[in-house]
Every structure is written in C-alpha cells, then in structure tokens.
Amino acid sequence: EKKVIVQRIREIAAYKSESPLRKFRSVCVLLLSTMVVYAASPFLTANASTDSTYHFSGENTESINLSSHFNGTNGSFVLYDTANDHYMIYNEDLSTQRVSPDSTFKIYSGLFALEEGIISADSNERAWDGTLYSIDSWNQDQTLATAMQNSANWYFQELDEQTGYPALRGYYTKIGYGNCDLSGGIDDYWAESTLKISPAEQVILLSDFLRNKWGFDPENIQAVKDALFISNTDIGTLYGKTGTGSRNGRNTNGWFVGFLETDENVYCFALNMQDSGGASGSAASEAAVSILHDLL
C-alpha cells in the first residue's frame, strides 16, 4: 500500500503545481452538548453523539467541492489546519457519519500496545507463525513499522489479544474513539463490525495524537508516528494509514487518514469513500494525495 501511495505522489508532483490554501475568515468555535467545554481545541464525547453520527459543530469551517476527485463515488474529505485552527470539508453530512474504521484502527492498536508494554519503541518485532495469507507481505515477521505499512492484520490482532478487552475499552474511551463499541469480537471489531468512527473524528483524533493530549509516553507517540511515515513530498512530509472494508467480496469502504508536515504547519486529514464495489484504501489514498496537492 505504501508503494502505491508513493508512486501516486510522484505522478501528481510531475504535473501539478502548488496552489495556496484558501484563507479563512471566521473564528473556530467547537461546542458539544456536555458538561465539559474545551476552549483550546476541538473535542469529542460519546454523550454528544449517536452511534451512527458524530455531532460536530464549528464556525471555523469552509465547505469545498471536491466531487471531481471522487469520480462518482460517495465520500467525504476533512482537512484541519492545526496552526490556524481551520477546517476545510467536502460533503459535511458524510463527514460526521460513523462507519467502520477498518485498518485505520491500527494506529491506535499499536499505540495502546506500546502503552501496555506489550511492545516497545525499540523492541516490537513479532514472529510470523507460518500461516499462509493471500497477501504475501503478511507472510513474514513484522515490526510495528512493517505491519503498519503492510497492514498486516495478524500483527495487530495479536497485540489486541494481549492488551485484552478491559484495557482496550479503557483506552478507546479515554481517547474518545467514535462509538467505542468493541462488542463485535476482539479479532475483528474494527472490520465492518461494531466499532465506528466518522472522518471528522478521525481528524480530531490525529490532532490530539500529535499534541499527545492524552498524556501517553512521548516515546510511544513517536514510535507510532514513525510507523506511519510514507514519504517526503514536494508539499511536505506525508504520514498516513489506509483502510479497506469489504462486504460480500466487494470493496465498499475506503479510508486514508493521516497528516502532512510542512516547515511551518501540520495538516491533519481524513478521506472516506463509500461504494458498492469501488471503494478501497488505495483509491482513497490516491484521491487524498491528489486533493492535498490541489489545496496546499
């Protein structure tokens, strides 16, 4: 997956020039109908949302039309300018609709395992047990970085099993991850099952992750960040994770979430697409990279 994204970046860089990010004029106000108000940053809470929808409210947003990047596929895109506290959103209704995170959950599965001491920044290789998978890159020992890049399910399933339900529930609740519903089973609660999250929440979580709002070990935050590295591009350093959800043998849910670091700013983003068969992590990453080159 990483190779596909890097190749797409090179193709776009070859024919697209940089364009300035649109300027915003309003002041950000993010309010949730709970007892707690975080004036310094956007936040989320399960009490303010239903299982299927996240109630995101903010004045400092700009709606943009990116339909040409989706080629008829239903989807949404959220970009958060962390330096200026600004949002750009395509398809606001879908940006708050919660769907399965699929492999994007691995960002936090790895982080929780680090916090639990199951793996460490310096020691995170796990041995392949010999099970033959249809994806060749899974059929080998994995580190946190290679497992993230190869999206090796077995690696993160092992981490979750060792972390265990009680700790996982505690961590997901602590960071406010979507609906925090792990009832679908420890092996696949994240794969078109019970755990759901919206693109808007994905972006907020990434911002919280980079600021280490949760007070985790900074070394663990850095280890996950390093594992998410994709490439140095002409517009900045790109980090991210794809996700693909399938139903009845067809790819119906595609994710690409991550952040782009420039010399002066960090942009967190999430792209999700829904389709009867054409949505995938690779399609989402291709669209997101193209959008980033257009906007930044």
Q: Across the structure, where does each feature detected by a protein language model lie?
A:
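Hydrophobic topogenic segments
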Residues: E1-T50
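Structured C-terminal helix/loop/strand segments within mature extracytoplasmic catalytic/sensor domains
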Residues: A46-S67, N71, R98, E161-P166, ...
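Short N-terminal helix-loop-first-beta-strand/juxtamembrane motif that initiates sensory/input modules
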Residues: N71-D81
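Short, conserved catalytic-motif segment at the N-terminal edge
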Residues: A83-T96
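Active-site SXXK
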Residues: R98-S123, A147, Q202, F269
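Short, well-structured active-site flanking segments
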Residues: E115-T131, D217-I221
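Acidic helix-start/capping segments at beta-turn-to-alpha-helix junctions
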Residues: N124-Q140, T146, T163-G164
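Mid-domain, small-residue-enriched loop/turn segments at the edges of structured enzyme/sensor domains
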Residues: T143-L144, E158-L206
